[in-house]
Amino acid sequence: FKYRLSLRDKNNKAKYIDIGKFNDRYFVYTASAGIFTKASYSAPQNIKNLLGHFAYVLEGVKDLTQVKRMKLKIENEDEVIEGEYIFVAICNATSIGGVMTIDEGKVDFADGLFELLLIKYPKDLIELGIIINELTNQIYDKHIRLLKVSKLKISDSSDIDWSLDGEKEDGRKNMKFRVIHNAVKLVY
């Protein structure tokens, strides 16, 4: 935790961090939907205790057989984005579930912005290979988008379930997100 917040070499200082508000619920780390997100709240606690991170990997493998497309309309301050996606995350973190990483230089825990990560639904195996390469190499291009946002409106053609910091949030067709800037004071 200390490492993730860049607190490793300091003592007795205070640092403020942003949190997110997703509809009526607050979260610190990530709100996500799509492939692999169900693993964060469906892996049994005793298995998580026994296997740690590997429990999430095992649970996530089940998702590979049921990849669903999400038809999303996302409105932020600068643009309207519409498309079919297999994954969406609104996060203030450099790692999402230990599976995906975002370059440390792109994330600031107290800038009033969260990162919006979108992964397009692949049309075929070739496009899937491109997406895997982009994920592995942290390339944000036409298949994977990374944007900084302070508020969003998200509309979905169906009610998709979300994971908020690993807890299930039942799906809705219309969702709102906003950053609460410098909401939490950490003393270290």
Question: Model segments located where?
Answer:
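ATP/nucleoside-binding phosphotransfer catalytic cores, i.e., glycine-rich phosphate-binding loops
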Residues: 76-77, 82, 108-111, 118-188
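Gly/Ser/Thr-rich active-site loops/lids in small-molecule metabolic enzymes
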Residues: 47-55, 96, 105-124
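Glycine-rich phosphate/pyrophosphate-binding beta-alpha loops
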Residues: 32, 36, 89-105, 168
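Glycine-rich beta-alpha junction loops
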Residues: 23-24, 31-37, 91-94, 120-122, ...
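A residue-level signal for conserved active-site and pocket-lining positions in enzyme catalytic cores
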Residues: 20, 39, 88, 116, ...
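Short acidic/glycine-rich loop or secondary-structure boundary segments that cap or lie
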Residues: 37-39, 82-84, 95-99, 124-127
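Catalytic core of DAGKc-family lipid kinases
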Residues: 1-86
